[in-house]
Amino acid sequence: MAKKRVADVLVDTLVAAGVKRVYGLVGDSLNGVTDSIRPRKDLQWVPVRHEETAAFAAGAEAQLTEQLTVCAGSCGPGNLHLINGLYDCHRSRVPVLAIAAQIPSEEIGSGYFQETHPEHLFAQCSHYCELISQPEQMPRILEIGIQTAIARRGVSVVALPGDVALRNAVEQEPRLHFPPPKPTVCPADDEIAALAKVLNDSEKITILAGAGCAGAHAELIALAGKLNAPIVHALRGKEFIEYDNPFDVGMTGLLGFSSGYFAMMNCNTLLMIGTDFPYQQFFPKHATVIQIDIRGEQLGRRTKLDYGLVGDTRVTLQALLPKLKQNGDDAHLKTSLEHYRKARKGLDELATEGSERKGSHPQFVARTMSELAREDAIFACDVGTPTIWASRYLKMNGKRRLLGSFVHGSMASALPQAIGAQMAMPNRQVITMSGDGGVSMLLGDLLTLHQLEQPVKVVVFRNDSLSFVE
């Protein structure tokens, strides 16, 4: 039997970690890795036209599946093109491993052709970034990178010189296993009791809920019912919060509704759950503010807190609900809902087809897309005006998903995220809401869709401008 090479061990380790696909663009320095993948039936190489597409696509797959996904780039400019997509993955907290090929190991530090230092370049957009310089480091360094990406929910980068990938591997037993993390952290009983007392004594409560409420829809609705509290949702929380929610009053912030802003600014107590909503100017100045988040480092970093609890949304609310009294005052809720009704009516009136217009205006297109899409469709929207139309006119139902560069705010994310979504979910309908500026940045990857024969529906909103910044 032929002796395994380092690249073979890399591929074996990825498969053991449950990886299904590697998104990337081939290059000489990646030949060892791609040659090792080629005969495999349990790992697919997904070719793209630009490495940034590979990173965005991997991030989308990781977000939808909650499983580790991999992208790869050749040495120097090749893997450097990954960086913008990796920033998005890291800030969105999805588990992605990047394989960054490196120049020949004996040339590192000599100013060689295409020389860069990935272990420095990717340090700010990763939890783990290391160079494998000799076969003895495999698979241990790769395993640590995988475990870190999964456990800390973010990016790991492993740099691998092309010549090292082709060397004979040193036989080593795998050390680590890769169970997906499912934290169920709950605050202490005395913290829950103190929070319940504050809420029971409060009037005019508003809930601001974000993506951290995923999987806790029933508990969140029950909480709002107990407190008679309107729910303002953050953009990333839309898909988890908005549907089947009689307490929802829309978003606040730059893309938000007047009703969401009203509910926030007119509350006496603001309860933030699973959100890192970034815009300080949209927080009330004189309300009591409470924040629940699984990540303790996020408590109080957007606005001054009176109470902060570290906990998983679902188990924390399950512990809290039995201790709450029914709030008998629904005046704040009713007023906020009336504001929402009026705001929603105004937005819906903008989404009607007008005979006086030439062509279809974007609000009408977005609403029509929502009406025609399948009940489990996956939408990927570009930043700028497509995100506005998505946030206001796409109807979520608990089955649909919404992808976008909502934290990093990068142009051109919709098309590559749709590629990753369709590869991961081949039986789901995937639709982009692309801006003409965004789609043009990575236009070459329309060829990727054609090559892969993926049925992504690419909808381009053309306004002949970068309208959100002009």
Can you name each region flagged by the protein language model?
Residues 116, 138, 144, 148-201, ...:
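Conformationally flexible catalytic loops at phosphate/diphosphate-handling active centers
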Residues 9-19, 60-66, 90, 148-152, ...:
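Glycine-rich phosphate/diphosphate-binding loops that line cofactor/substrate pockets in enzymes
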Residues 20-23, 44-46, 64-103, 208-209, ...:
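A short, small-residue-rich loop immediately preceding and capping a beta-strand
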Residues 2, 136, 159, 171-172, ...:
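Phosphate/pyrophosphate-binding active-site segments
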Residues 100-140, 237-339:
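Glycine-rich, acidic loop regions that bind phosphate or pyrophosphate groups
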Residues 63, 211-294, 397-428, 440-444:
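Glycine-rich, anion-gripping cofactor-binding loops and their flanking helix/strand elements
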Residues 99, 107-114, 300-310, 314-320, ...:
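Thiamine diphosphate
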Residues 7-10, 15, 25-28, 34-40, ...:
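Active-site diphosphate/adenylate-binding microenvironment
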